């Protein structure tokens, strides 16, 4: 039998300082503040950020009052845009709000006398995906892309002396070589990292300002040495920390790879000053990095009555629990809804030929409806989606994150709430029982 050729697959991630992610984080911060005061809030909040300004737009139905100015500015400052030289600064940027009341036509289809029969907030299809690339059941290229940027941000926030030139904006990309027969990762093929930075003079050229160095050595020489220093730090600080954070089996894949660091040669102008940021423009980064499928609906700024968000989380939960239970090695789940209708109009499953015990995809899809209650109200209750839990989802992915509980203030009371509940594996026993798996 002829062995299939190995193949390459690539995914990217962006940092919390990427302009589109700044917009996502602003939208989810505002959503959280509405839910903190009024868990029944209906919110659809879009954000736009550019040089020196933020505009917040959308529809809201809530009893809460949210200080938009304070929420936006604190989010921007937390990310790290707190210097005038960035041309986008949480302390001085303009903040405009164009939030208005939600359409009564939409609201009457969502809210029902019987809360359990709450209708879907819109029509559409949502996808969930899981595979065995990583212990979190996520595709390896996206997992590594997220992790590299989380480590980079951690250095910038907590150990700035290690790479003191770092600015908030960054992008990463990992290309993974896969075995053509088993479809398992073989090695890391290529890493791309573009990280925004100050204009600085490396120690190799002496102690002086950038302007003085350019005058003495010429700009080409100074910029070359500057990028050489950044690359050296990536190779000796960042990549070793990445490998140390990985399980041993995965860390062994990170060797003899191609590395591109700031391949344009310079990345000083960035963030919302370099590119306009909009909510919902990084939906592939937010989900599976191009693996599986995507229904097109963004997440950030949307309360859980919007099935774009809540049903996508439910689909991920189902796919992950199916793979963890041993139903298949890879699984894609599609849920589809009609606006104002509680139950999904369809459930679709694709296991890419990896289903166990002769199970058919149609049979798996049928059983999903028996195991999981996919009405929006039940999804919301199961994952605690009326709590202010969305801020952490708005950077470094909504899927594949470690679930945890934390005390938060809701309606003036401290309570313990679940974050990333859709990543729990608490339905594995029920799935095994339903499919007769030991």
Role assignments for model-derived ranges:
Residues 10, 70, 77-202, 219, ...:
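Glycine-rich, mobile lid/loop segments that gate access to catalytic sites or pores
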Residues 12-14, 18-23, 118-135, 268-293, ...:
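Conserved phosphate/anionic-ligand binding catalytic regions in large, soluble enzymes, centered on
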Residues 41-45, 170-176, 257-261, 327-338:
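A short glycine-rich, hydrophobically flanked beta-strand micro-motif that places a catalytic Asp/Glu
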Residues 43-62, 339-343:
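Short, charge-patterned binding micro-sites
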Residues 227-325:
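Glycine-rich anion/phosphate-binding loop at the beta-strand->alpha-helix junction
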Residues 1-44, 428, 434:
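N-terminal, positively charged regions that mediate nucleic acid binding
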Residues 50, 330, 338-438:
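Internal helix-turn-beta structural module
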Residues 16-35, 130-153, 302-326:
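Alpha-helical support elements that line or immediately flank enzyme active sites
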């Amino acid at each position: 039998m002829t062995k299939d050729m190995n193949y390459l697959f690539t995914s990217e991630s962006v940092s919390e300082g990427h302009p589109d992610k700044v917009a996502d984080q602003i939208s989810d911060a505002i959503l959280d503040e509405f839910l903190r005061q009024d868990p029944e809030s209906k919110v659809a909040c879009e954000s736009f950020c550019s040089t020196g300004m933020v505009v917040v737009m959308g529809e809201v139905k809530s009893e809460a009052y949210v200080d938009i100015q304070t929420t936006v500015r604190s989010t921007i400052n937390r990310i790290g845009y707190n210097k005038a030289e960035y041309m986008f600064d949480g302390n001085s940027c303009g903040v405009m709000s164009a939030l208005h009341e939600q359409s009564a036509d939409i609201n009457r289809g969502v809210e029902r006398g019987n809360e359990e029969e709450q209708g879907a907030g819109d029509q559409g299809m949502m996808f969930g995906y899981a595979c065995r690339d990583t212990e979190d059941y996520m595709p390896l290229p996206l997992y590594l892309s997220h992790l590299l940027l989380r480590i980079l941000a951690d250095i910038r926030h907590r150990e700035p002396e290690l790479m003191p030139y770092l600015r908030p904006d960054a992008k990463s990309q990992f290309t993974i070589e896969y075995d053509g027969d088993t479809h398992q990762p073989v090695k890391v093929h290529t890493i791309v990292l573009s990280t925004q930075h100050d204009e600085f003079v490396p120690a190799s050229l002496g102690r002086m300002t950038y302007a003085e160095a350019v005058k003495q050595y010429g700009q080409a020489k100074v910029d070359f040495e500057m990028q050489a220093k950044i690359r050296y730090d990536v190779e000796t600080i960042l990549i070793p920390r990445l490998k140390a954070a990985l399980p041993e089996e995965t860390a062994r894949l990170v060797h003899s790879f191609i590395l591109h660091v700031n391949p344009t040669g310079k990345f000083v102008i960035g963030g919302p000053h370099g590119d306009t940021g909009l909510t919902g423009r990084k939906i592939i980064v937010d989900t599976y990095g191009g693996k599986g499928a995507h229904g097109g609906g963004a997440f950030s700024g949307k309360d859980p009555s919007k099935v774009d968000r809540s049903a996508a989380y439910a689909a991920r939960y189902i796919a992950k629990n199916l793979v963890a239970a041993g139903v298949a090695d890879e699984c894609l789940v599609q849920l589809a809804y009609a606006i104002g209708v509680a139950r999904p109009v369809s459930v679709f499953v694709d296991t890419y030929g990896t289903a166990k015990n002769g199970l058919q995809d149609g049979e798996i899809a049928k059983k999903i409806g028996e195991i999981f209650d996919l009405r929006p109200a039940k999804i919301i209750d199961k994952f605690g989606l009326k709590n202010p839990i969305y801020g952490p989802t708005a950077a470094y992915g909504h899927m594949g994150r470690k679930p945890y509980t934390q005390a938060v203030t809701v309606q003036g009371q401290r309570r313990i709430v679940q974050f990333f509940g859709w990543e729990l594996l608490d339905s594995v026993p029920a799935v095994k029982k339903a499919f007769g798996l030991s």
